[in-house]
Structures are given as C-alpha cells and as structure tokens.
Amino acid sequence: MAENSYCKRRQVGALVVKDKMIISDGYNGTPSGFENVCEDNNVTKPYVLHAEANAITKLARSSNNSEGSTLYVTASPCIECAKLIIQSGIKRVVYAEKYRLDDGIKLMQRAGIKVEYLNPDEKSASEED
C-alpha cells in the first residue's frame, strides 16, 4: 500500500480490516485534486494527509463501519492520527516502523486501543505502559 504514495521522503500505507475483510485503505499524499507532489525542497507540504487519515476519511464516505476494526499501518501513528483512530472506533493498531514521537501510541493506549509493534526484522511485542 505504501508504494502507492507519491511522497519521496517517506511512504506510508494503511489498511482497515474488519471481520477478516479490508474495508478501507489509504496512503500518505496530497488531497484529491491537488498535484501529486508532497515535498518542497525536501520539506513535506503542510497539507499532505497521513495514510491513517486518508483511510479513515475514505471510510466516512462509504457504507462501512470501522467500529471494532484493526488498523494496519507502516509507521506508528502521530497524535493527530491517534485522535482520528480513537474517534473512528478502531480497537487495534498494528504498525511496523516506530515514529520518532510516541505520544500517539500513548494516547491510543489511554483510550483502551490495543497497540502492537510488528516488525519482521525484530521480535514482535505488544506495547504497554
């Protein structure tokens, strides 16, 4: 999924899964109708959407319900995406790369969301405070 992103600095993908079915997907990139250029001089443009936000807003425009679903995402969610995840009813988040800040993880855990770090190069572990 991440390879669909036009962003050069970092490509992130997200899948929302419920009852073993993919109900939404997203990747980081510019809003619909904008040019597919995410950076200016290697700095990410402020209006670039994160993969999680794209997957969740895509769900909002569909007939699917994310209550109780699992989000699989390339990198651990930032705090802004964590807020969207909490509000969307997603109950589990699995990620493969650590983001430089962990405030999003802490917020999701505080909300009772199960957060798992799953990296094929490292031993799998559930993150808990």
Describe the residue ranges of each PLM region.
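Zinc-dependent deaminase catalytic domain
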Residues: M1-D129
